[in-house]
Curated annotation (Swiss-Prot):
Name of the encoding gene: uvrC
Record SMART domains: GIYc
One BP annotation, GO: SOS response
InterPro entries reported for this sequence: GIY-YIG_endonuc, GIY-YIG_endonuc_sf, GIY-YIG_UvrC_Cho, RuvA_2-like, UVR_dom, UVR_dom_sf, UvrABC_protein_C, UvrC
Alphabetical UniProt keywords: Cytoplasm, DNA damage, DNA excision, DNA repair, Excision nuclease, SOS response
Family to which this protein belongs: Belongs to the UvrC family.
PANTHER family: UVRABC SYSTEM PROTEIN C (PTHR30562:SF1), UVRC/OXIDOREDUCTASE (PTHR30562)
Protein localization: Cytoplasm
Highest taxon, organism lineage: Bacteria
Protein name (database record): UvrABC system protein C
GO cellular component annotations of the record: cytoplasm; excinuclease repair complex
Length: 598
């Protein structure tokens, strides 16, 4: 069936939900309407809805199904359920993954501790539990935990270790724990320290900042510049994560502020979380192919984002009112939040800040416009390359050889899906590439890409095709990108692309969006490969060449703490004492090696 043949005669004028499908019956988009006939009429008329993303959607639609309901509230709930069921390409769809970084305090233990966790739910899962966050990143979360352990000496050990300890650990000697495990402090003293830490996490950071500034000044006066620099880094992280910001005028409120950026089918929503005048964090959601109206988009987003156990603030600021007045009462909150477009100057400033955050997220996408249609037309791909994998490898004179692939999916990089391979073959780059590709596709448990991109010329392109043929994966498209020596255009080096449509290669203008898109993929893969190589190289040096007595387990703990060989050798004795498993002899050997390396 062609969409031009779709008839409105049998479409009801009642509230309901409509499902747009492609020629294969796949649901592309789910929408709701107060009047189904009027809404679909606006889509089907030639001069109806002229928004850029609507023709983009209708061009792919072959049929429309409708479901009639009693009222708008039922339509909203049904729309949300169908979006979850069919996961349409052009709707808002939030992935239910563990992306919240929080700090948790379990009050069930008589001597509570603060620990970093990752969780879906932003409301406590236990009756006696406090959650703080979410924080912008794992780095911010662990930085706060480090500050707390320094200024609020609470225990960090497991409950089992706490119950079996006979003497205090090294953290007590460093004045970073009150040692309640061996009775060195009273419960009243410990509780007072815990309450101060809780106030800090709620945003009362002024006293801590003042103490840090005084400590930095004292360390500088005593010429302990390395220690002063470490304190300054901590102070900077606190200010970035917890200090008063532009939102300080809303000191009494618990607010989420939703900002929206749109460009064609691209939609980005930023959520700023404000508590007691502090900007606690921001989360960003990118929908590369969204066809919803702004009011409908916010209804879908809010219903999904605040589903079930998610933290629900008292107020939600939005630039456009959701199209469902009953929305606050559909959320799982004891007190329905107020969802509104603020009229005050301060509220408008917050919305502007949220919009700016959303626009900032779009910059990497806007600088390289995603040329999906151009890619398909130029290279004659059989389908849209929604999932792209780019491969690279790194080594030094054949040692510590690593191969990697990165994933670009639905309009953005997906670092969680990046993978690393330790290369075992001892041939050239082609042999290493063949090993990586073979190992990647030998197991088909991971989702297959629509397109793979490799750094190399005609030989790499042919080798990739040969491997895919052997694995019976000829449906995966391949593009190889190679620098064209001697060819320059306006100071920009030209590069040649090899693919099935152009097996001898094609030269594109250096300003071409397609070329820049592939360069972006290749550069990200190269960056990831170099980082993986450096980690492997550092670990190899540490375990096999440099320091006796530092085995695999201690190496892992050191690298988790300091990230690189250079930082390990420059670490102070106090910093090294915080690494699990290191003895005084180990610390002495590391510092001796550091002096030799200077």
């Amino acid at each position: 069936m062609r969409i031009e043949d779709f008839s409105l005669k049998n479409v009801s004028s009642s509230p309901g939900v409509y499902l747009m499908k492609d020629s294969q019956g796949v649901v592309l988009y789910v929408g709701k309407a107060k009047n189904l006939r009027n809404r679909l009429s606006s889509y089907l008329q030639k001069n109806g809805d002229s928004r850029e993303r609507i023709p983009f959607l209708m061009k792919r639609t072959a049929d429309i199904d409708t479901i009639v309901v009693s009222n708008e509230t039922e339509a909203l709930l049904l729309e949300n359920n169908l979006i979850k069921k069919y996961q349409p390409r052009y709707n808002v769809l939030l992935k239910d993954d563990k992306t919240f970084f929080c700090l948790s305090i379990s009050l069930q233990h008589p001597w509570p501790k603060i620990e970093a966790i990752r969780t879906r739910a932003l409301s406590p899962s236990k009756k006696k539990q406090l959650l703080f966050g979410p924080y912008v990143s794992a780095e911010a979360c662990y930085a706060l935990l480090e500050v707390i352990s320094h200024w609020f000496p609470l225990r960090t050990c497991s409950d089992r270790e706490f119950s079996t300890r006979q003497r205090p650990c090294v953290l007590y000697e460093m004045k970073r724990c009150l040692a309640p495990c061996v009775g060195f402090c009273s419960q009243t003293e410990y509780q007072e320290t815990l309450e101060k830490a809780i106030l800090f996490l709620k945003g009362e950071v002024d006293t801590t900042i003042a103490n840090l500034e005084e400590a930095i000044k004292k360390a500088s006066q005593e010429h302990k510049f390395e220690h002063a620099a470490a304190l300054y880094r901590t102070l900077t992280l606190i200010r970035q994560t917890m200090a008063k910001q532009h939102v300080e005028k809303f000191q009494a409120y618990d607010i989420d502020v939703l900002g929206l950026y749109r460009k064609g089918p691209l939609a980005i929503i930023s959520v700023l979380s404000v508590y007691s005048g502090k900007l606690l964090g921001a989360r960003h959601f990118t929908f590369p192919e969204n066809a919803q109206e702004d009011s409908s988009l916010f209804s879908s987003f809010i219903l999904q984002y605040y589903a079930e156990n998610t933290r629900i603030p008292k107020q939600i600021f939005v630039p456009v009112s959701p199209d469902s007045p009953e929305l606050p009462y559909l959320l799982n909150a004891a007190e329905p939040p107020k969802i509104r477009c603020p009229k005050t100057e301060y509220g408008k400033e917050l919305l502007a800040l949220a919009h700016k955050n959303a626009a900032e997220q779009a910059k990497p996408l806007n600088s390289i416009t995603l040329p999906y249609e151009e890619l398909q037309q130029l290279f004659k791909f059989s389908q849209y390359p929604n999932r792209i994998e780019c491969y690279d490898n790194a080594h030094l004179q054949g040692e510590h050889n690593v191969g990697v692939y990165i994933v670009f999916e639905k309009g953005s990089f997906s670092p969680k899906q990046y993978r690393t391979f330790s290369i075992t073959s001892h041939g050239d780059d082609l042999a290493a590439f063949e090993e990586v590709l073979t190992r990647r596709f030998r197991s088909l448990t991971t989702e297959l890409p629509d397109l793979i991109v490799i750094d190399g010329g005609r030989n790499q392109f042919r080798r990739a095709q040969h491997i895919l043929e052997k694995l019976n994966l000829t449906g995966i498209a391949v593009v190889s990108i190679a620098k064209e020596s001697g060819n320059h255009s306006r100071g920009l080096q030209q590069e040649k692309l090899f693919c099935e449509a152009f097996p001898q290669g094609i030269l594109l203008n250096p300003t071409s969006e397609i070329l820049q898109f592939f360069q972006l993929l290749r550069d990200e893969a190269h960056r990831f490969a170099i980082n993986r190589y450096r980690n492997k190289h550092s670990k190899a040096i540490l375990t096999t060449k440099k320091i006796p007595g530092i085995g695999k387990t201690k190496t892992t703990h050191l690298l988790q703490k300091f990230k690189s060989w250079k930082r390990i050798l420059s670490a102070s004795e106090e910093e090294l004492k915080t690494v699990q498993g290191l003895t005084k002899k180990d610390i002495q050997r590391i510092q001796e090696e550091g002096k030799r390396a200077e």
